[in-house]
């Protein structure tokens, strides 16, 4: 099985970035990655909007898909139509609000959430965490069988998240995933993002 950058969604986390964040985003934007999810959970809405404006400029220049995260108001203010949401936020949006997004993703942690996300109009989902990860220390991964069950239950692309690396990306693809998510700031993935 051939794995390429187009199988990878890069998820930002400035705190993991070992180099200038904007330089890192520029490098990733020049790759063939499927996209960049601008996560940055620690920022206020105003801070997130300021960052999003800069990142969107970089991504648009390189023709890289950027997906905003959580802040639906920022997406509206910027007239931007791609967002990734936690399920609790997705559930609060009206059909009209959901339909305003051309790309609508959700973070799913169960088979039921995956089916619900698809029924709510998501165009893709992330499912996890699949493997043990530093982000969820002490919690065992849900495993490849969990991922396979989700991939079989929905007709939209599923991206595995949690502990995804070059050694296991083939395994998640074989389970039916469209690809995997990696933290784009992690220095251990330099070879994937350059």
Predicted feature descriptions by range:
Residues 35-44, 62-91, 102-113, 126:
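Catalytic beta/alpha-barrel core
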Residues 42-55, 84-99, 112, 133-148:
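Active-site-adjacent beta->alpha loops and helix N-cap segments on the catalytic face
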Residues 78-85, 105-148, 152:
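Glycine/Thr-rich beta-alpha phosphate-binding loop at enzyme active sites
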Residues 190-194:
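Conserved small/polar residues in nucleotide/adenosyl-binding loops
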Residues 14-15, 66-72, 87-88, 106-114, ...:
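Glycine-rich beta-to-alpha transition loops that act as phosphate-gripper elements at the mouths
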Residues 71-80, 110-120, 164-178:
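Catalytic cores of alpha/beta
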Residues 53-65, 102-107, 141-159:
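Alpha-helix-loop-beta-strand connector modules within alpha/beta enzyme cores
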Residues 6-20, 105:
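Active-site mouth loops of central-metabolism enzymes
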